[in-house]
Amino acid sequence: MTKNKSKNKSNNSNISNNNNNNNNNNNNNNNNNNNNNNNNNNNNNNNNNNNNNNNNKNGESQLKNKNKNISENQHIYDKHNHDHSHDHNHDYDDNNEDDEEKEELEHYQLIVSTLLNYSQYSLHWVKDMQDFFHYKLSEDEKKLLPNYNAKMEALARAVLVNSQFLKKIGNEHCNIFSQSSDNSANSERIVDPTNLDHIKIDYFMMDQLKSTIRQLVREWSEEGKLERDQAFEPIKQQLLEIYGHIPFQERSKIRVYSPGAGLGRLCLEIASLGFSSQGIEYSFMMLIVSNFMLNKVEKINEFKIHPYIHQTVNVLRDIDQLRTVTIPDVLSSELLPKNNPALEFSMSAGDFTKNIEENSFDCICTCFFIDTAPNILEYVDCISKILKPGGTWINFGPLLYHHAKKKDSIELSYEQLRYLICKKQFQFKKEEIRDAEYCSNQKSLLRSIYKCQFFVVINNKPT
C-alpha cells in the first residue's frame, strides 16, 4: 500500500457532501493499496489503492485544489484553503507557491489524460499479444490455439467498455474554472479530449488506473460485499457499540476521520450511521474516481466494467478474465441520512500527516492503512494529536509495510507496534486477528488471505 506519489498537497482537494445537499441532488437529479489482485502486480495494486490518502456545511459536492474549479456541480477550488502548517513555516513565497500550483496542475492533467488514454494504451497491449501469436508462433503452434484470436477480439471489446466508463470520468474533469473576484467562473480547459495524440502515456499512472478499476469492485459492487463485510462491518459495529446510545439525529456531533479513504465507500457507510464523516486520500486518481461515484452516478448498476481483463495469470477460464461487474450497488444519496443538516460528509486530498488539526476528531478509523507508512511512529503520533482526549482509534488491517524494500522505512512487529501505541497514552479495549481479502478476484486461481489486526484503543492523553 505504498503511497501514490501525487503532486497535490494536503488539504488542496476536497470532495464534500452532506445530508441537506444530497437530498436536493436526489430530488432534482437523482445524483449525488494492501492489494493482492492475484497477478504479478499484487503489491502495485495495494500501493495505488490504500494510501495516505473540508467539512463543508453548504454540502455541495466539491473538489478543491487551490483556485481551480473542475466539473459542473459548483466544484470550487479555493486557493486560500492550502494549509502551510505542515512545514511549520508560514513565510509566503510567491515563486514556490506558483511552482507548487504548476506541479499540481500538471499532475492533474496527467491523471485526466490517463483516464482518457486508457483505450489507446490497452488496445496496444492487446495488439502486442496478437502480434506475438501471429509472428512468434509456428503454424503448428497456432493450430493448437484455435480460439486465441477470438479471445483477443473479446479483450479488445472489453477494453472499449472500460474506456467508455473511464472517459465519462475524464470528461467530467477536462474543464476547470478560476473563481474571479466577482464570483464569475472563467472556463479553462486543462485537457482537450479530442486531441490526445501528443500526450505521452505514463505507464506508472496507467498501472494506478488499472488498480483503481479493481478497487471499484471492492467498494462499489455487489461482488465486493464479501470484502466490505470482512473489513468495514467490524468498524461500523464498533462505532455503534461506542456511540450507539446517542440518538440518531444527534450523532452528527460525533466527528469520524478516515485516512486512506480510497473510493469513499467506508466514509459513506460511516455517514449512513448518522456520524459526521471525513475522509482523506493521498491519490488524486482515487479522489477523482470517488467524486464521480459519490456525485455523478444516477442509478444503481448504471455502469458495466471488465475489471480483470489485465490479469493474465492464474486464470481458470477465459470467461473469468472477461467477465463484467456492474457498479454501483448503491447510490450515495440513498445511504446518507435524510433531514439532518448538521451531518457533514466530505473527502479531501492530501497526506494526513501534513494536515494536522489537533483535538479535532472523536474517532479515527484506519482500514488497510497503517502499513502504508514509511515511518509508522509518525502515523501513531499524528493519530494521537488529531484525536480529542478520550477519543477512539479503530484499526483494521495487516502489517504488509509496502515501503519495506526502501532504506528509509521502519517495519515494526505487532508486538512492537502495540508497545508504541501504549506509550502514546492509548489504552487497548479490544484486540483480535481477523481474516480478510483485499481486491481479490473471486474467480482467480490465487487468492491471498490477510491476518488483520483489529483493535480499538482509547486516547488517554490529558485534556
Curated annotation (Swiss-Prot):
S-adenosyl-L-methionine binds at Q215, R218, G260, E281, D351, F352, C367, Y379. Residues 94-103 have a biased composition (Acidic residues). Transmembrane segments: none annotated. InterPro entries: CARME, SAM-dependent_MTases_sf. Residues 1-64, 79-104 are annotated as: Disordered. Carnosine binds at D371, H402, Y450. Keywords: Methyltransferase, S-adenosyl-L-methionine, Transferase. It catalyses: carnosine + S-adenosyl-L-methionine = anserine + S-adenosyl-L-homocysteine + H(+). GO terms for molecular function: carnosine N-methyltransferase activity; S-adenosylmethionine-dependent methyltransferase activity. Residues 79-93 have a biased composition (Basic and acidic residues). This is Carnosine N-methyltransferase. It comes from Dictyostelium discoideum (Social amoeba).
